[in-house]
Amino acid sequence: MSTQSDNVDWVATVGMRYGARSRRVVLTAAVVATSLTVSFTAGCTHRGRDDDRAPQHIPAPASPLTRPASPAHSTAGSPLAVKIDNAPAARPQTGLAAADVVYTEPVEGGLSRLLAVYATTLPTAVGPVRSARESDLELLRQFERPALAFSGAQHKLLPLIGRAPLRAESPGAAPAAYYRGLGKAAPHNLYLRPARLLSAAPGKRALTTGFGYGPAPSSGGTRTASRTVRYPAARFTFTWSAQRSRWLVAMDGTPTVTTDRVPVAPATVVVQYVRIRGSRYHDALGNHTPYTETVGSGSAEVLRDGRSFAASWSRPVATGGTTFTARDGRPLKFAAGQVWVVFAPAP
């Protein structure tokens, strides 16, 4: 029997834990908190312009990046990770359908951000690009020195980013890789030219996520027409399309398409139950930034081929990927194609 709607609702839990308030306060927090983000300069950190206070118009570069290619820029096997804005004012996004993996993360005010990972394809542009969070550093350690494209970060977080085993590529570090687009107001209009950071897509070998791909389990699973996961101020719905053999994404009730009108449709969706706690960082109103713990183990749901499979996840160390097993203890394979991982709080 098909399940028409199966919701994960943690509005009350996270709303109380992280200080989600009225819409007016949330919007005020989003504006005020921008004063806390800063950018990198090439090779070092400092207090500079952030994603909200950057120049209103950064033209798209007319020529390739002119700085010499460093070993970091020519290293094979390093994927590109882009922190993507997911506020309603930022939609539709650009380049999202081309990502190999999309992680959804809770941020202040009950909102969400996306972390998109690119390895097999580099789209012409990606964005809007927004600021990084502490959780991103732990999540990205599974990759071999990835390039992280982000608009800025809270100044107290910058030393951590500077010491992390990744290439921090903010507008201050790689100004020629970014531009301000038309049609959206700042800070929702900062875009990345991936080719200015990576000379070529590194390929599947760079996706050291721990995911296995292959046929679905021959038995088990529940027929599922749609699945909804709720954050305090964001909602993700994945609806199975037998015609496309994909899950069609909708955010806050609106179908998700890119700026070039391509539907975002992953082959596999994972609802991963993790510990979400307050971090050491907070916004201007005192609301702690959520920290999503992705090292450890727990339960999960894997959606593929129109069915939902109960699973367990395990990531013993930050430098390793995450494996998923079915109830019978066998590895739970993903369908070939884009993967969305939605982090939800463990019960």
Would you name each region that the model predicts?
Residues G15, A29-V32, G48, P61-A62, ...:
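Generic N-terminal leader/targeting and pre-domain segments
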Residues S39-A62:
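C-terminal region of N-terminal signal peptides and the immediate post-cleavage residues
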